[in-house]
Amino acid sequence: MDFNISDSQIKWRSVAREFATKIITPEAIERDRIQLAEDRIPWDWIKLADEAGIRTLGVPKKFGGAEESILTMCIVGEELAAGDLGFAVIMDQCWKMAHLFKDAMTPDQQQKFIPPFVADNQATQLLALQSQKSALTIKDIMMALILE
């Protein structure tokens, strides 16, 4: 088994490291001290991450994404987290949901939901879970997708 990272992973690691060094790190402490959470959301970073291809790293190529592996996204996430963990989590949610959409949606559903996500350079995604039970198991999860 080869434990070396691929050329693509090296490329994306470099992109993420440069992004964290040049974009995130210079502003991270100041942004973290903003009192209101809604003012702290790094919309400018999200746009720049889109320009760099980071935001759509998990989106299938046929929809304009990089369609990278989970391991590649982990490598990129680690580099982003070195700059700001909160921002890395925002990107991670985008990647996680893109893989879920690819794997769990029908082609018609993919066509309805993935292109609008790719087209909006500030679009982010999240997964929220709620259970009526005190303990949540995977069989209890029911999902609905809402396009706003």
Question: What are these model-predicted stretches?
Answer:
Residues 15-24, 47-52:
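N-terminal glycine-rich anion-binding loops that anchor highly charged ligand groups
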Residues 1-11:
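Intrinsic disorder at enzyme termini
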Residues 30-148:
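Glycine-rich flavin
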Residues 26-28:
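A short, surface-exposed helix-loop junction/capping segment
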Residues 13, 17, 109-110:
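Short, cationic motifs built from Arg/Lys/His that form the positively charged side of catalytic pockets
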